[in-house]
UniProtKB/Swiss-Prot annotation:
Residues 315-335, 431-433, 547-550 are periplasmic. In IrtA the ATP-binding domain (NBD) and the transmembrane domain (TMD) are fused. In addition, IrtA contains an N-terminal siderophore interaction domain (SID) that binds FAD. Belongs to the ABC transporter superfamily. Siderophore-Fe(3+) uptake transporter (SIUT) (TC 3.A.1.21) family. Part of the ABC transporter complex IrtAB involved in the import of iron-bound mycobactin (Fe-MBT) and carboxymycobactin (Fe-cMBT). Has a preference for Fe-MBT over Fe-cMBT. Mycobactins are then reduced by the siderophore interaction domain to facilitate iron release in the bacterial cell. Transmembrane domains (TMD) form a pore in the membrane and the ATP-binding domain (NBD) is responsible for energy generation. Residues 1-293, 357-409, 455-525, 572-860 are cytoplasmic. It comes from Mycolicibacterium smegmatis (strain ATCC 700084 / mc(2)155). The chain crosses the membrane at residues 294-314, 336-356, 410-430, 434-454, 526-546, 551-571. Residues 609-842 form the ABC transporter domain. Its main location: membrane. FAD binds at residues 70-73, 87-91, 97-98, 238-240. InterPro entries: AAA+_ATPase, ABC1_TM_dom, ABC1_TM_sf, ABC_transporter-like_ATP-bd, ABC_transporter-like_CS, FAD-bd_9_SIP, FAD-bd_FR_type, FNR_nucleotide-bd. Changing residue 55 to E: Cannot reduce Fe(III)-cMBT and Fe(III)-MBT. This is Mycobactin import ATP-binding/permease protein IrtA.
Amino acid sequence: MARGIQGVMMRGFGARDHQATVVSTEAITPNLLRLRMVSPTLFEDAVAEPTSWLRFWFPDPAGSKTEFQRAYTMSEMSPETGEFAIDVVLHEPAGPASRWARSAKPGDAIAVMTLGSAGFSVPEDPPAGYLLIGDAAATPAINGIIGVVPHDIPIEVYLEEHDENDRLIPIAEHPRMRVHWVVREDATSLAGAIEARDWSNWYCWVTPEAGSLKHLRTRLRDEFGFPKAELHPQAYWTEGRAMGTKRGDDDKTPEVNPAPRADKPEAPAPAAAGRGNWRAQAAGRLLAPLKTTLIISGVLQAIITLVQLAPFVLLVELARLLLSGASSDRLWTLGVVAISLLGTGSFLAAALTLWLHLVDARFARDLRTGLLTKMSRLPLGWFTARGSGSIKQLVQDDTLSLHYLITHAIPDAVAAVIAPVAVLVYLFVVDWRLALVMFVPVLIYLVLMTVMTIQSGPKIAQSQRWAERMSAEAGAYLEGQPVVRVFGGAAASSFRRRLDEYIGFLVAWQKPFTGKKSMMDLVTRPGTFLWLIVAVGTPMITSGAMDPVDILPFLLLGTTFGVRLLGIAYGLGGIRGGMLAARRIQTTLDETELVIREQTGKRDGEPAVVFDNVTFGYRPDIPVLHDISLQLTPGTVTALVGPSGSGKSTLAALLARFHDVDAGAIRLGGRDIRTLTADELYRQVGFVLQDTQLVGGTVAENIALADPDASIERIQDAARDAQIHDRIMRLPNGYDTPLGAASSLSGGEKQRLTIARAILADTPVLILDEATAFADPESEYLVQQALNRLTRDRTVLVIAHRLHTITHADQIVVLEGGRIVETGTHERLLDAAGRYRQLWETGQRPALATAAGPTGEAVR
């Protein structure tokens, strides 16, 4: 069958035919047909991810040997069985795809390719929301995206209605999704229907008819400010060209009054807002002060590159003069000029590098200062949501990546472009025929690179996800070595299995490219260019078609042509890495800071702590705490209990102002905590977390974090009260022993060290995340003694994980689903036979099971 130049090119890029056989057909709507197919080899190349699409070769309805290529997104896929489905819009008049689909029956076969398809995946740093725009043809891809978007991220779907049956197409479910149907009156209808609001940091998937796409791109870019990185446009079809045939006037889309879907009521519209900052443009904002400097450095590098090439040109002219018998004075003059230019080029290159290093040093100083200042104003919740590794990467590694971008990447990239272009121009002037030969290795390299890039397709994104996943798992595996070694191979074998899967993925991806990579390396070597120059230049010289001296510039400059071209990739790679680092840094600088509000008045006579109708959510419009009202009387212990995910830790974190509430207020001694500075707040509120943290420094410095000026006597008294003094004295240097990540203290000892820190801080209000949860029995007793001393005469809010530790609390608050469901003492709540009693009885069952004897009966 004839596929024309398009088919030849696709085969050249490594695409291969797979035969797909129709299994069944199903009419989703009167004008949308689902074809279920099976192919035993398709998923050797295809990726089973949302939005993955296939290239079908449909026969010509006229009966010729020509085949027509059409692309369809898979609406169903099963790599294990090789089964998949596509949804075909049945156009009238029918083109090749529509006509074939209408007549398709089980057993019919068709050729399929997978070249160029890329799947969709939710990024690790999710966008503010997803704006999905299309029509009936785009619904398989849109449904695929909806199916993997987390339920706490909003989705806005705009679908263009070309036929009254379009609204019958099933749309995937999502709790935060709104679907808008827009009747097509002309190509501007869909663009005009997009809500005027702040779309900052939304991901936009645009796949409508080609005419609509043109107007959509204009409005999304110009009015809403969508950057290219967040705008993913592609025309799925063109009106008037019904799958390759001319559409007549009779099949004009009928107008239908828009109506909301019966099975999918729309949620309230979000409030309009002004245009905000886009994360995709963050790098540009960070580097804006350096824009002029970087442009100047690029221009200077271009000049320096030409100056550095000039001596080689003069060397060729020197050889030409020498062979022609020129006078020694002329030769000396030319030689001195060449040496002078060589020295000048080296001096200018060194001066440019020195200048850029000075610029980078000042920029890095200001950047680190601004970054650390910003971090001091961020809520503590920002830090708890990130590991120390990511913060280290931000402050240290990313700023180092900017060093290469500022000082080296631009000059390297400019030199890599200017040098080969200048060399090529000069060689064409010398002899255009031999210069033309220099393109042969370059073209081979570019073709091979293009083929590899196209064949890699979705595997590039997969490799990035694999690398991120393996980096995280390797870190967790190394950190958990003590546990892994004690408890054996389960964790180790799991990590090794995942590592083997990763290696298998890389081998399967790269093995077919072995020959291509070897060829790419070969064609860019200086020896390859030298062989070409000699092989072509020698016959030209012997035949008199070329002056012998003219081959010298090719031997001096042409042999390095391939190496110079490779410098472009290295320079662009450095720019790409630096821009990603700049984006991460600027995104951090754009984070919302804690704002100190003006004090509007103090409510005298209030309890120590008051939660007044507090509502809070980690993402907008998704509250995890609902209208929490709670009072903590001075000198009492209040325990928060509830199942996992009920909001205990979140509620306690709000008192420490890890985050600001969305609604309501938290008052401390009658003052809204948002009117307190960090120093004022943490002089009154202390906390002991279950996940203890030690900082680099001595034992004494760790205890004295809250009061760096504390005397050694006060530090030791706090340690005695925390039952840790004797253990400290057994350390090599006592209180002067350095501690840190490699500390030899046990978990219980670290907990007692943090309790000593809280005792020394002596705050009237204490937040306690049940610190004995992971302590051994002996250490638990010492920790409990330390806690008894710590909680004396304080207002305590304790997050209880084991109910038997809080039976004597003055007040027990039961949370479920972010709401308070019960409040009272242990005895009253047990008598009430409510949720607390259920939790209590559930907590007793493991204890009986643990105490079971050999026969399985409980030991009394």
